[in-house]
Amino acid sequence: VTKLPKYDVPEGYDSWSYLNKLCDDGLAERYGDGDQPAGETGQTLRERLDYELGVIQRMGYVDYFLIVWDFINYAKEHGIPVGPGRGSAAGSIVAYCLKITNIDPIHYNLLFERFLNPERVSMPDIDVDFCFERRQEVIDYVGRKYGNDKVVQIVTFGTLAAKGVIRDVGRVMDLPYAFVDSIAKMVPNELNITLSRALEMNPEFRKLYQEDEQVHHLIDMCKRLEGLPRHTSMHAAGVVICQKSADEFVPLSRGSDGSIVTQFTMTTLEELGLLKMDFLGLRTLTVIHDAVKFIENTTGRHIDVDAID
């Protein structure tokens, strides 16, 4: 069971009717110049919207969409640059009508089922890009709205990788740094490389391992520790929003900078049915925003990046 927080809707609405109102308004704005789109095209759009809304309601994700709509709306109202859409969420006309995404799924013939499949129950996952410098403002807003005790960032565990474990174990064994560093540099610069794979790939490394007893002992110790957690840090984007105080669902810890983070990783939080959101800080958005401001300040001409075809 997903533990979704409730979104506080205006008086006279429930979550379902408010989501429908927002989507109707968005459909008129996106496709009908302020009026509901008419004719055969209008009927096709309405059928697609009603289909998606039906799936969202049956799967119990109405409040999820309202929560995402709300913090994106806050960002846009406060001049915080927001990305046009990332990943499978761009295939949803509901997301497009709510201005969660800015990519027309009908024009580009995108599939809603890549995002939310009625035959496979899984949490929708809307990753949102924000200006790198102002991302924290959006997280702070979510904390104020739902309660800072209910909104916490997510831990991530750094593990002992091939080169790092050689240096760490070498230091514990009190071996000379230059000697240990030279061994670590024999590990090829390859993504997710393991010590066993490095020994296969580098004949010089393998020869040293086979002939030097000290190196053999060092690498054997490293193999036993390789892949184990080394340290904790804060996930670059993940934030969990709870129905009740977060400590009722997960253990928490305080980071070195004083921030509160979960002790469970993102995967475990999803298994518990908690709402995990990705607030991604994207430097590209900051650069584009600064460039648009610079052009306006120097030429007086305002460029709407979203209107560039």
State each model region's role:
Residues V1-D309:
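Alpha-helical scaffold/interaction cores of sigma-54-like transcription cofactors
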